[in-house]
């Protein structure tokens, strides 16, 4: 059965939330919106999240662009404020102009913080995004048109795999 198709949703329902910070060009929001289609999730900004209410969700996504080699301050602040939870499934997703630098796993600090709060982190998705920050602005930016359709389909496939993992877990029934 196609996990992104309507038959899957009818056979099992889960409550999902995607928390997203997307400031410069809307790169991360485009990824969040595509994942939300697959997960039937609401996409919100960190300021609109009541940390105490996250226990209502089966799955929570945390997404941000990478700004000067780190996730956005607003997402970091929200994660610090989160209470300890009992195994809520989570995932991370990031967009970056420079792409993933092999020795710098941008999602690792976020994954570790979420795990320390009791979240079960199921995976991370990253892709390139259009970037005009700093010196890139002088040359018209890098990765124009990213994330592109191919990137968004990869994001949807990632979300579908996460959805299957949540549906197959004992806590999901």
Describe the residue ranges of each PLM region.
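Selective for proline/serine-rich intrinsically disordered segments
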Residues: 1-4, 145
């Amino acid at each position: 059965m196609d996990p992104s198709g309507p038959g899957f949703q009818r056979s099992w329902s889960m409550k999902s939330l995607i928390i997203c910070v997307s400031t410069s060009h809307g790169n991360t929001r485009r990824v969040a919106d595509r994942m939300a289609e697959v997960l039937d999730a609401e996409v919100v900004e960190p300021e609109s999240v009541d940390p105490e209410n996250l226990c209502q969700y089966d799955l929570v996504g945390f997404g941000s662009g990478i700004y000067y080699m780190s996730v956005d301050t607003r997402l970091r602040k929200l994660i610090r404020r989160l209470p300890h939870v009992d195994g809520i499934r989570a995932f991370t997703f990031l967009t970056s102009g420079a792409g993933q630098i092999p020795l710098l796993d941008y999602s690792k600090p976020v994954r570790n913080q979420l795990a320390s709060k009791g979240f079960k982190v199921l995976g991370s998705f990253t892709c390139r995004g259009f970037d005009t920050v700093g010196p890139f602005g002088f040359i018209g930016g890098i990765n124009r048109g990213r994330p592109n359709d191919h990137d968004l389909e990869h994001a949807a496939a990632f979300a579908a795999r996460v959805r299957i993992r949540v549906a197959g877990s004992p806590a999901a029934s």
